[in-house]
Each structure stands twice: as C-alpha cells, then as structure tokens.
C-alpha cells in the first residue's frame, strides 16, 4: 500500500503545482515522512467504491483514493448530537499530510473530505485558515460575508480564520482536498447560523 500512498502524494503535488490558488495558499512540504496509520474503513467511505470521476484532470487522484479507501484512517470528528445521524452516514475525512496523517509534517495539514449526495455539512468554524479544492462531484459552499458558490472539480474556496462556513451536496457526491496552513491544532466548532 505504501507505493499507492506515494503515488497519491505525487499526483497531488502535480495538481498543486499547476493550480495558482493552491500554490499561493501554501507550499506543499518536500520532506514528508510516510506514516503507517491504522486503517479505519467507515461506512460512508464505502460509498466511494462504485463512484466514477468525470473530471479528466483529477480522475487519477480520485481513483487512487478509491483504491486506498479500505486502508485509510477515516475519521468523523463530530458527534451525532451535534450534526445528526444522517450527516454522519454520509460524511468522512482523513488527514493525508499533517501531524497525524499518512504523511507526517508540522508545516501544514492536507485533508481529504467526502460528502455523499443530499447532505448538509452544518455551519462550523475554526482558527485555521483553509482552502477547499474539489476533486470530484460538486457542492454548494456558503460562508459568512461571501456569496455562495457551487464548486465543481478544480474550483477552490478560501475560508478565513473563524469564518463560519457550510457545504451542501444535492444530487452529486463531493470529494475535496482541504488544506490548513496554520493553527494545525484548531478545534472545529459547530456554530449557529
């Protein structure tokens, strides 16, 4: 599996270097250390199995994540009382690069987030600045002080420190990269709209 994780890392480096918004947000560290993390294959991640990407530019990354999915340390962060059972059945993420990721670094965090169709990722915030980059599917991105936007593959969305934001999927799933460039230990908090 290590080779496949390295392939994923290399494909993401290539995507990053070819996207001005991503490369201006933060540089990806060159000194990542592979970390063999205990897999945690959660139910929502299994929904990736039969999902085909239609974006030629990101298809390779999508397909590698699909192949690796059973070997990834998927997480959910939230409790049912805060976000509801329905949300948790359609949501998962993992840290690919970061202090506890599949590749270790303290310079930034890079997460992969999966949202199934017909899902609402409630309003939340955190101290870390972040940028979303959609790999597959689409979602409606909303944030306080900004216009909402439907993001499709190759599109980005920046969130300032403590800026409340939410995501909604409709008839499509959404697979995204999410980078934090500072405050890597930020707590994610659900906020009232």
Predicted region positions:
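A short hydrophobic beta-strand segment most commonly corresponding to one strand
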Residues: 131-133, 156-158, 171-191
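A short, N-terminal "cap"/entry segment at the start of jelly-roll beta-barrel domains
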Residues: 5-106
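Short acidic-glycine-tyrosine-enriched beta hairpin
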Residues: 145-164
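Short, conserved beta-strand element in jelly-roll/cupin
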Residues: 112-118, 125-141
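Short histidine-centered beta-strand/loop micro-motifs
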Residues: 104-105, 121-126, 143, 168
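Membrane-proximal helix-loop-helix units in multi-pass membrane proteins
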Residues: 108-110
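Short beta-turn/strand-loop junction motif enriched in small, turn-promoting residues
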Residues: 99-101, 119-120, 163-164
């Amino acid at each position: 599996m290590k080779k496949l994780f390295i392939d994923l890392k290399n494909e993401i480096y290539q995507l990053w270097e070819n996207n001005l918004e991503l490369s201006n947000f933060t540089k990806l560290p060159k000194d990542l250390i592979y970390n063999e993390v205990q897999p945690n294959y959660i139910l929502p991640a299994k929904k990736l199995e039969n999902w085909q990407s239609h974006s030629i530019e990101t298809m390779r990354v999508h397909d590698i994540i699909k192949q690796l999915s059973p070997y990834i340390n998927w997480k959910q962060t939230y409790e049912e009382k805060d976000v509801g059972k329905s949300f948790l059945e359609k949501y998962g993420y993992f840290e690919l690069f970061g202090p506890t990721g599949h590749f270790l670094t303290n310079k930034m965090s890079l997460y992969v987030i999966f949202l199934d169709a017909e899902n609402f990722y409630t309003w939340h915030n955190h101290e870390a600045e972040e940028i979303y980059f959609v790999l597959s599917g689409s979602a409606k991105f909303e944030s306080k002080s900004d216009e909402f936007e439907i993001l499709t593959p190759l599109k980005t969305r920046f969130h300032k420190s403590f800026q409340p934001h939410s995501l909604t999927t409709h008839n499509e799933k959404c697979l995204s990269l999410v980078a934090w460039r500072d405050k890597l230990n930020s707590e994610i908090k659900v906020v009232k709209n």
